[in-house]
């Protein structure tokens, strides 16, 4: 498998944003775009070797099963397309309630549309 191809497994620890301070930094210092069922906050990381993803899904979206599914769909969209990003960045995706019940293709289309509109893809 090529070095830049998506792996078959999920995102590793180094590819996820977990700390509250990182989420706050993106919210205050990062750029923001609202499109479709997603809100994207991002901050470019010059010199970083990989991009990282954080996902926020509130209880307004649905119960725990729905929220977990939405998180999986967003992480998978990022995993498949992370090598298409123009440069490494921290990206936080906030799911809006309209995402509940959507199929993977719809979520992926909104994800790519958001990144494309923000100029984050190669």
Predicted regions: what they are:
Residues 1-122:
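Positively charged, solvent-exposed patches that mediate nucleic-acid binding
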